[in-house]
């Protein structure tokens, strides 16, 4: 090894070929930038003020697609996870169903657990960290018992999972907030609501009243109902909200 270390190699840029800026296609133009809000503080003015770039452009495209699908009588499928419910967006979805915009709901089991608890007792979303520490996470007696009993009845009667839970809620007269339930709204409006369970991944599955066969049967019925709806999506829209895995 020589006493004098060699200098690190450096790339030679002398043969690089550049291109004129005028010949380059740009993804962002001056006209695409946002505009500060003026005197008009309406929501439509806010949307119009957004930049025509990336997610703002995508958001406008989604809105336009939903409007076009609704006006032409096409299907709008809203697939969702539990966070859509637990972060307080239920009233918006119910409003969209009432307006005839959302024509089918599909969710995992987490979403209907939160929906059931909100309608039944007016609260949901336990403290996971504290519950794991003392072993009580997912151990709510009434939630697990009532929902599993409804699913078992639904399996015997050939119902889907979503239909079974909606019927169980509808039969009760002691609900804290029935007006906040997606299950009840879908039942009232005749909007399909299919539930696609992940066996072993939802808190009611560890309850002694859980019946894996009943959960699987009713969820499979809902899968078939979802597939039967899919032809309506020709020219329609599929939304996936808050479910990065199951839906």
Task: Identify the function of each model-found stretch.
Residues 2-156, 163-247:
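Metallocofactor- and cofactor-centric catalytic cores in central/energy metabolism, strongly enriched
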